């Protein structure tokens, strides 16, 4: 979350000192009241959120009629996706103070990456014919092949002592956690 929820902004007391005597953001604008946080605390040095998403869809097909009544259609549907999300909540951010303001437990960064691809290849053969000009028949055969693959990784770090690291220095975090997953499935149908 980049800053307070909208209801926090709507119910905030409009009194207090937004800046201290040095011109810095005052985290607690109402003196002696730690329940109200300054809604202007997040800036580029103490909070970041970045997302990248790419999706590619491909759907080529071919349809051939080699003789009267016979058609063959072949279709390929493919999808490639990639997403990456980076987040950083550092010393001095709104969420840092909201969580308690402890550098060892309330500063964190996360990188999440998801990649997947899948495709489906379908072949459809159809034959139309008449018998004695009064009966019309249609025969259809279908085959399908599909393949799905996904891998996900997530890296998190808690206890980041310096805001300059953002998510790029997770090895410097006091507590690190990494996880990954992979799944694949294939199928054929007639």
List the model feature ranges, each with a label:
Residues 63-68:
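Long hydrophobic segments that form regular secondary structure
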């Amino acid at each position: 979350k980049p800053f307070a929820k909208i209801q926090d902004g709507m119910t905030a007391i409009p009194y207090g000192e937004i800046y201290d005597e040095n011109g810095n953001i005052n985290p607690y604008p109402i003196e002696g009241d730690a329940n109200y946080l300054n809604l202007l605390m997040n800036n580029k040095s103490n909070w970041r959120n970045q997302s990248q998403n790419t999706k590619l869809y491909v759907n080529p097909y071919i349809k051939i009629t080699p003789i009267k009544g016979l058609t063959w259609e072949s279709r390929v549907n493919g999808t490639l996706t990639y997403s990456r999300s980076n987040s950083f909540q550092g010393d001095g951010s709104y969420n840092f103070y909201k969580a308690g303001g402890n550098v060892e437990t309330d500063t964190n960064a996360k990188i999440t990456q998801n990649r997947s691809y899948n495709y489906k290849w379908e072949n459809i053969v159809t034959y139309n014919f008449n018998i004695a000009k009064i009966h019309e028949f249609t025969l259809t055969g279908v085959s399908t092949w599909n393949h799905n693959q996904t891998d996900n990784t997530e890296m998190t770090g808690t206890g980041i002592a310096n805001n300059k690291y953002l998510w790029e220095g997770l090895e410097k975090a006091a507590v690190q956690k990494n996880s990954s997953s992979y799944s694949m499935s294939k199928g054929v149908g007639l």
